[in-house]
Amino acid sequence: MRPSERAPDQLRAVTLETGVNRYAEGSCLIGFGHTKVLVTATVEENVPGWMRNKGAGWVTAEYGMLPRATHTRGRREAAAGKQTGRTQEIQRLIGRSLRAVVDLKALGERQITLDCDVVQADGGTRTAAITGAWVALRLATKYLLDEGVLKTDPILGQVAAVSCGVFNGVPVLDLDYEEDSNAEADSNFVLTGVGDIVEIQATGEKRGFTRAEFESLYGLAEKGINELFALQRAAIGG
């Protein structure tokens, strides 16, 4: 039995609220149960120096946790003067995941930055950030298309992510913090709308896990991500 009493293949309650920031070209507040992540998309009419004069744009991401996103207050990384390795790893993952479904040439020489701020953390913040960031990015590119800034849609498809793990010997979908901190194995899957793999992170925490268990986790991830794709489409109006 899972602590939340969910079935092994059941996502937490997922919510996607759009238009939560009046200034950003795209914004989304995504919830996976008690995990809440605010994502804003900012369009800038320039690209990093190493991308100049290449006729293509760039999509990048930043990730951070608000001080009281967890049970105890965490110091702001800005106050500490540097980002942790975890933060850098996660924001690179978010950027890679989004670029997998973007035609950078169609974007033109402009950059879209997805700022992912964890308001409340209860496991799965990186996967929630990726799933919500796609919604904010899609809204930002739709804005650019509607305004006539872009002539060709740069979005090639959807991307979403979910965690899976082995908890009490059973493969389960979408781990919350209690499950994640006690899992025998955990993983994160990032898949596109056509089923391509962008990234898989899988780790044996308390023991190694078998190929059969991995395939079970993969199957759970596909099921959960397909449900997330439907929620993404509903959030952007189809």
Swiss-Prot record:
The keyword Cell wall biogenesis/degradation does not apply. PROSITE patterns: RIBONUCLEASE_PH (PS01277). GO terms for biological process: rRNA catabolic process; rRNA processing; tRNA processing. Phosphate binds at R86, G124, T125, R126. CDD domains: RNase_PH_bact. Transmembrane segments: none annotated. One of its GO terms (molecular function) is 3'-5'-RNA exonuclease activity. It catalyses: tRNA(n+1) + phosphate = tRNA(n) + a ribonucleoside 5'-diphosphate. Its EC number is 2.7.7.56. Keywords: Nucleotidyltransferase, RNA-binding, rRNA processing, Transferase, tRNA processing, tRNA-binding. InterPro entries: ExoRNase_PH_dom1, ExoRNase_PH_dom2, ExoRNase_PH_dom2_sf, PNPase/RNase_PH_dom_sf, Ribosomal_Su5_D2-typ_SF, RNase_PH, RNase_PH_bac-type, RNase_PH_CS. Belongs to the RNase PH family. Homohexameric ring arranged as a trimer of dimers. Phosphorolytic 3'-5' exoribonuclease that plays an important role in tRNA 3'-end maturation. Removes nucleotide residues following the 3'-CCA terminus of tRNAs; can also add nucleotides to the ends of RNA molecules by using nucleoside diphosphates as substrates, but this may not be physiologically important. Probably plays a role in initiation of 16S rRNA degradation (leading to ribosome degradation) during starvation. HAMAP family: RNase_PH. This is Ribonuclease PH. The gene is rph.
